[in-house]
């Protein structure tokens, strides 16, 4: 049974791809957002369609508010009723207190926090109140276990955390707003394979989360009709580890 269309931002690769595939298997039509990953996006569209699902791909630069504002109307006109959004797309570039710049701060905030606000607003305005819609924001375990590295990124995730609670209160009953906070799931560009393995093995559970683990939690929240304003940590307990620096740097020594 088709459960309506879900927009997955950054839905073509990595964790976003796992989320898109899982929600498709749940019966949702998938609107795969991409910016520069057009090849990956349309390949995933074909994979979903070959498995009997419904999918299409939509381009937008989430650092550009004008492009963001066109995304929900375009998906609605192409794919019909939108029953949810997964705000998965995220910029993760290094800065700290000494290296932070206006460009870094603004780009992180635009992509990681402002674009989710605009998409949620457009979904709320589109929703006629007859069918409750669901939003899942992808956060980070850093929201309870911060360190000085990736300062703009971390601040943007704290902003999205606050929005999750605020909007869950104010947009009910038309929209449910929840979040998933992953741990270190995929190796960073600066990280070696051995460093990534070390970072996952050092968690309290002795292994790290997989993209599919994240997708399973998103799937639950997308369909849990009585749940709003909640955060699920999918981090193998990483948030209990106190680190002076980001895990990428601590596991490379």
Labelled PLM ranges:
Residues 12-14:
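Conserved glycine-rich cofactor-binding loop
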Residues 23, 161, 171-185, 227-234:
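Conserved Rossmann-fold SDR core element
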Residues 28-43:
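Conserved glycine-rich Rossmann-like NAD(P)H-binding loop of the short-chain dehydrogenase/reductase
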Residues 88-93, 237:
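Conserved NAD(P)H cofactor-binding loop of Rossmann-fold oxidoreductase domains
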Residues 96-97, 101-106, 199:
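Substrate-binding pocket helix/loop in short-chain dehydrogenase/reductase
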Residues 132-159, 164-172, 184-185:
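Catalytic loop of short-chain dehydrogenase/reductase
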Residues 211-234, 239-240:
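C-terminal substrate-recognition "lid" of short-chain dehydrogenase/reductases
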């Amino acid at each position: 049974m088709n459960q309506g269309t879900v927009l997955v931002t950054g839905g073509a690769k990595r964790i976003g791809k796992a989320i898109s595939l899982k929600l498709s298997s749940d019966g949702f039509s998938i609107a795969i957002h991409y910016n520069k990953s057009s090849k990956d996006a349309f390949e995933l569209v074909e994979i979903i369609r070959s498995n009997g699902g419904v999918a299409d791909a939509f381009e937008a630069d989430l650092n550009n508010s004008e492009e963001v504002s066109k995304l929900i109307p375009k998906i609605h006109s192409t794919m019909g009723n939108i029953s949810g959004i997964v705000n998965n797309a995220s910029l993760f570039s290094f800065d700290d207190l000494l290296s932070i710049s206006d460009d870094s701060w603004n780009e992180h905030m635009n992509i990681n926090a402002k674009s989710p606000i605009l998409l949620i607003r457009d979904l709320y305005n589109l929703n006629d109140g007859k069918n409750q819609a669901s939003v899942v924001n992808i956060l980070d375990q850093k929201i309870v276990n911060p360190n000085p590295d990736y300062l703009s990124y971390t601040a943007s995730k704290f902003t999205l955390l606050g929005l999750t609670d605020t909007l869950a209160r104010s947009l009910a009953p038309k929209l449910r707003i929840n979040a998933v906070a992953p741990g270190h799931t995929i190796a960073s560009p600066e990280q070696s394979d051995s460093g990534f393995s070390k970072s996952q093995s050092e968690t309290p559970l002795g292994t790290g989360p997989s993209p599919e683990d994240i997708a399973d939690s998103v799937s639950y929240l997308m369909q849990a009709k009585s749940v709003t304003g909640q955060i699920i940590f999918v981090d193998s307990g990483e948030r209990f580890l106190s680190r002076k620096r980001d895990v990428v740097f601590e596991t490379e020594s």
